[in-house]
From Swiss-Prot:
Keywords: Amino-acid biosynthesis, Metal-binding, Methionine biosynthesis, Methyltransferase, Repeat, Transferase, Zinc. The keyword Methyltransferase applies. One of its GO terms (molecular function) is 5-methyltetrahydropteroyltriglutamate-homocysteine S-methyltransferase activity. L-methionine binds at residues 445-447, 498, 613. Zn(2+) binds at residues 655, 657, 679, 740. Belongs to the vitamin-B12 independent methionine synthase family. Gene3D superfamilies: 3.20.20.210. It comes from Psychromonas ingrahamii (strain DSM 17664 / CCUG 51855 / 37). This is 5-methyltetrahydropteroyltriglutamate--homocysteine methyltransferase. The active site is at residue 708. The gene is metE. Binds 1 zinc ion per subunit. It holds the Pfam family Meth_synt_1. 5-methyltetrahydropteroyltri-L-glutamate binds at residues 126, 529-530, 575, 619. Signal peptide: none annotated.
Length: 767
């Protein structure tokens, strides 16, 4: 009998209950006890919802109030000293201080009276090749570890009251160290022996709780890791494999390649493979695992929202099941954290498109159906399999998906469409003469605070409570307010503020053909930040201009230059749930053609600085470096396609966030944007080290303060950061800007922060 389980379930709640509870807690409207009660209710509901799915093991430890890597840091007692403001190291105050630089608003008052209420937030970066972000663990020569498993053990006890077959999930010790960053010249692998003692202690506590199986995630096995890290995995599991619990080593997000034999031969009880992305490794894994170990196959794609082809998957599994019998386990490919919770909440979605989709609940239902087909025979689920086959075939042939005229446009793309007339230095001189900007020009990344009034306005429009004319009037009032505020703050290049946009990708998807939208298909990006990605289901085109009206109006209000604000094709692709029936490259070029039309229309309307955000350029880099160049070739080509065709005096900007780009700097230079703004403040400008060896010819704005933290940046701190930047990049190429958009901040935070930023720029000009 094949056993069924999952690697993790979404934690935010089907109506984003966790987000709202967190924000109330941070705002002082909810006590710590009330927050913990809300969290417990969410966990309980998740477990109850899974009871009808015939799972053999129930997962615990997949829930987090902010981030599972941060949870692991607190579980093993690795807490930065700057965050230890509470006597209890594992307090929520300390936890949120690491996550966001501050816990609750009263700390702001403490800080203003000279107390240490604020601290620098932990660095945040992408979780492998997903749109989830984790708080980077910090290590130094003084790092020690101390187990504090109280919260996790309480969760285990709560789940055991519902079902005794409990499987805790933890991040493996080697992956945990790999994900972290040394803050000095120490070597983090030297910390492994002490860390393993804490893990061994934790596994012993699990055994005392009558736990049989523990899921231990080591996703670095899908990377090309150095030999010493392979050896670290071997030594780690030689020790941990001696515990009284059985270890299910889990990998996800791709193939193991050279690490496959290593993983299979570790002293573990079972191995989970991503069978969606690496089905070709199954036979070798069976051979390497021997006759005693469990093989868990991730057969349901946990990173997209398309229905699984149940018949095809069953046919793939039948010979494997015959060979392994009860040594075969089935699960989604990774944690379901990366997909929305329940498709049944969507009652306004196009019926045909909806029939092609599966969210987290539906994916577990698919898993259950496949398990029943294997264990009880196809006849037990024949009706469900027949319906699934009809849906798969309908999608394959739907005229909603396939548009021949768009496919023809992509086939006719030529290299010349991605070329500017003049080289960067010639364009730079032309643009400086035309734009007449000061040294260290100041700007923002695009969005300004989304107040409750703005959100209510958009909701009123959606509900039909106001007409189009009323909506436009209010948006223009918001734009006017935003322009006036920027003028008063003394910024050099302004933006219209994006009041009309609920999300930088969703906004464009709503105006492009080939997308559909949901009401409740939220996924967690980080902490309380949730996104609702559009569903890119068909060929993409632009029916009409999308931003020209708003940017033109903003420009009419000021003598200063206003940037047009667009989202780039690679980011739209990477931050959407994308069709899987054609190459990503083809879909990306369709989007690029649509954005190119918008760029040209903005220029015709008198907008001569146009920012095309590629915040997610790096996000879909293959996990194996040997495959990077193929991705970068078409990603850079897509950007160049949409960014060119304009006059050389028109200045093209782009923005990248959460990006460690040192290893792709040559590709970024090939984008040939006139100015790039990047997120560097949390890394203390360390990201700029690459420019010591690489002569980057274009303008660059290294973010001088962290917008993800509510802390107000200090003038001298920003001056210091820019001086560090000027050691690596010629001062005449530098811009001064925040590291990301200001949408999630409040005006009372934004105004003093930008005022200080402008003051820093003026001080730099005078120095």
């Amino acid at each position: 009998m094949a056993k069924l389980h999952h690697l993790g379930f979404p934690r935010i709640g089907n109506k984003r209950q966790l987000k709202f509870a967190l924000e109330k807690f941070w705002g002082g409207e909810l006590s710590e006890q009330q927050l913990q009660t809300s969290a417990a209710d969410l966990r309980q509901q998740n477990w109850l919802d899974q009871q009808d799915l015939a799972l053999d093991l129930y997962t615990v430890g997949d829930f987090s109030l902010y981030d599972q890597v941060l949870d692991m840091s607190f579980l093993v007692g690795n807490i930065p000293s700057r965050a230890k403001q509470s006597e209890q190291d594992n307090s929520l105050d300390n936890y949120f201080r690491v996550a966001r630089g501050r816990s609750q608003p009263q700390e702001c008052c403490a800080a203003s009276h000279g107390q240490s209420g604020e601290s620098q937030a932990g660095e945040m970066t992408k979780w492998f090749n997903t749109n989830y972000h984790y708080i980077v663990p910090e290590f130094d020569a003084q790092t020690t570890f101390l187990l504090n498993a109280k919260q996790l053990l309480l969760q285990i006890e709560a789940l055991q009251k519902i079902n005794k077959n409990v499987k805790p999930v933890i991040i493996g010790p080697v992956t945990y160290l790999w994900l972290g960053k040394e803050k000095d010249n120490s070597q983090k692998l030297t910390l492994l022996p002490e860390l393993l003692e804490v893990y061994a202690e934790l596994l012993a506590l699990f055994a005392e709780k009558n736990i049989t199986w523990v899921q231990i995630d080591e996703p670095i096995l899908v990377l090309e890791i150095p030999k010493q890290w392979q050896e670290a995995l071997q030594s780690s599991y030689q020790k941990l494999g001696q515990s009284k619990v059985k270890l299910l080593l889990t990998t996800y997000f791709g193939e193991l390649k050279n690490n496959l034999k290593l993983a299979c031969e570790l002293p573990i009880a079972g191995l989970h493979l991503d069978a969606v992305n690496a089905p070709h490794e199954i036979d070798s894994a069976i051979d390497y695992l021997g006759t005693d170990k469990i093989l868990s196959l991730g057969i349901i794609n946990a990173c997209n929202i398309w229905k699984t082809d149940l018949n095809q998957t069953l046919n793939q599994l039948l010979p494997i099941h015959q060979k392994l019998q009860d040594r075969l386990w089935l699960a989604p490919s990774s944690s379901l954290l990366h997909v929305p919770i329940d498709l049944n909440n969507e009652d306004k979605l196009d019926y045909e498109v909806k029939s092609w989709l599966a969210f987290a609940v539906q994916k577990l239902q698919e898993l259950s159906l496949i398990g029943r087909a294997l264990n009880d025979g196809l006849s037990s689920v024949e009706a469900a399999f027949t319906y699934n086959k009809l849906c798969i075939e309908n999608r394959r042939q739907s005229p909603q998906v396939h548009k021949q005229d768009i496919k023809s446009k992509v086939l006719n793309i030529t290299p010349e469409l991605g070329q500017r007339n003049l080289a960067i230095k010639q364009r730079e001189a032309l643009q400086q003469s035309y734009l007449n900007l000061p040294s260290y020009p100041t700007t923002t990344i695009g969005s300004f605070p989304q107040t409750s009034d703005i959100r209510q306005l958009r909701q009123a429009k959606r509900l039909g409570d106001i007409n189009e004319e009323q909506y436009k009037k209010s948006i223009k009032e918001s734009i006017e307010f935003c322009i006036n505020e920027q003028d008063q703050l003394g910024l050099d290049v302004l933006v219209h503020g994006e009041a009309e946009r609920n999300d930088m990708v969703e906004y464009f998807g709503e105006l492009l053909d080939g997308f559909v939208f949901t009401q409740f298909a939220w996924v967690q990006s980080y902490g309380s930040r949730c996104v609702k990605p559009p569903i890119l289901f068909g060929d993409v085109s632009r029916p009409k201009a999308m931003t020209v009206e708003w940017s033109s109006y903003a420009q009419s209000l000021t003598e200063k230059k206003v940037k047009g604000m667009l989202t780039g094709p690679v980011t739209i692709l990477n931050w959407s749930f994308v069709r899987d029936d054609q190459p990503l490259q083809t879909t990306c070029m369709q989007i690029a053609l649509a954005i190119r039309e918008e760029v040209l229309d903005l220029e015709k309307a008198g907008i001569n600085i146009i920012q095309i955000d590629e915040a997610a350029l790096r996000e879909k880099l293959p996990l194996h470096r040997s495959q990077w160049q193929q991705y970068l070739n078409w990603a850079i080509a897509a950007f160049r396609l949409c960014a060119n065709g304009v006059n050389d005096k028109t200045q093209i900007h782009t923005h990248m966030c959460y990006s460690e780009f040192n290893d792709i700097i040559a590709a970024i230079a090939q984008m040939d944007a006139d100015v790039i703004t990047i997120e560097t403040s949390r890394s203390d400008m360390v990201l700029l080290d690459v420019f010591e060896a690489f002569s980057y010819p274009n303008g660059i704005g290294p973010g001088v303060y962290d917008i993800h933290s509510p802390n107000i940046p200090d003038v001298e701190q920003m001056v210091s950061l820019m001086k560090k930047a000027a050691l690596r990049i010629p001062a005449e190429q530098l811009w001064v800007n925040p590291d990301c958009g200001l949408k999630t901040r409040r005006w009372e935070e934004v105004k003093p922060a930008l005022l200080n930023m402008v003051a820093a720029a003026k001080k730099l000009r005078a120095s």
